[in-house]
From Swiss-Prot:
EC number: 4.1.1.23
A single Gene Ontology CC term: cytosol
UniProt function note: Catalyzes the decarboxylation of orotidine 5'-monophosphate (OMP) to uridine 5'-monophosphate (UMP).
Protein name: Orotidine 5'-phosphate decarboxylase
A GO molecular function held by the record: orotidine-5'-phosphate decarboxylase activity
InterPro entries: Aldolase_TIM, OMPdecase, OMPdecase_AS, OMPdecase_bac, OMPdeCOase_dom, RibuloseP-bd_barrel
Cross-referenced Gene3D superfamilies: Aldolase class I
Record keywords: Decarboxylase, Lyase, Pyrimidine biosynthesis
The encoding gene: pyrF
Disulfide bonds: none
The keyword Amino-acid biosynthesis is assigned to this record: no
One GO BP annotation of this record: 'de novo' UMP biosynthetic process
UniProt pathway: Pyrimidine metabolism; UMP biosynthesis via de novo pathway; UMP from orotate: step 2/2
Length: 233
């Protein structure tokens, strides 16, 4: 598996999601399962995706006391997911305990990444929750904390990639939502970029939802996006 595309499965019903999944090739993408689908369908849905040979990013953004988050991360590892995330704003100790609990899994441990600042948030949104910093400043602060905790990477907007690469180095994974092929609607994302632009900026993985899942021919759109990506990244 070398694809940089993670398809976001944002559906209300299992049959709708599996209809899409059965149209696309697991060698061309991974799949993201978020709060809505996981709350409704649970672990059996993740297992159904695994049975179809897809790697799964379990996007539940854990944020709780350290012991609770660590146990949740361990449950994700037992489920066999490829990647799982938590909120960096939960603090250093929370992230360190989550990372430590994965040690017994060795090379089979999922990638553990953090969410810094949601891509829907702008300066005013941060100010309204008491953070007197720009999204970029807060992202850098939380990405540095994430790296200090030993996690594998962060979710970040494409506009933040270059500065995070400079701050965190080439081995720190950068997972980028807010990806919209040319001509797509921005939806609820505020900081967006095309797939090729994000890879050129230094993203490792691109999270793409509606441009693929709502396409008339999802398989062809997925192939087209993969073909558009720079080959030297």
């Amino acid at each position: 598996m070398t694809s940089k595309i993670i398809v976001a499965l944002d559906y209300e019903k299992e049959e709708e999601a599996l209809c899409l999944v059965d149209q696309i090739d697991p060698s061309l993408c991974r799949l993201k399962v978020g709060k809505e689908m996981f709350t409704t369908l649970g672990t059996k849905f993740v297992k159904a995706l695994h049975d179809r040979n897809f790697d799964v990013f379990l996007d539940l953004k854990f944020h709780d006391i350290p012991n609770t988050v660590a146990r949740a991360v361990r449950s994700a590892a037992d489920l066999g997911v490829w990647m799982v995330d938590l909120h960096a704003s939960g603090g250093l100790r929370m992230m360190e305990e989550a990372k430590k609990i994965l040690e017994p899994y060795g090379k089979d441990a999922p990638l553990l990444i953090s969410v810094t600042v949601l891509t829907s948030m702008e300066d005013l949104d941060l100010l309204q929750i008491g953070i007197n910093a720009s999204p970029m400043e807060q992202v850098i602060r939380l990405a540095n904390l994430t790296q200090r905790a030993g996690l594998d990477g962060v979710v970040c907007s494409p506009q933040e990639v270059e500065i995070l690469r400079a701050n965190c180095g080439k081995d720190f994974k950068l997972i980028t939502p807010g990806i919209r092929p040319i001509g797509s609607d921005f939806g609820d994302q505020r900081r967006v970029m095309t797939p090729a632009g994000a890879i050129q900026a230094g993203s490792d993985y691109l999270v793409i939802g509606r441009p693929i899942t709502q396409a008339d021919n999802p398989a062809e759109v997925l192939k087209s996006i993969n073909a558009s990506l720079p080959v030297n990244r």
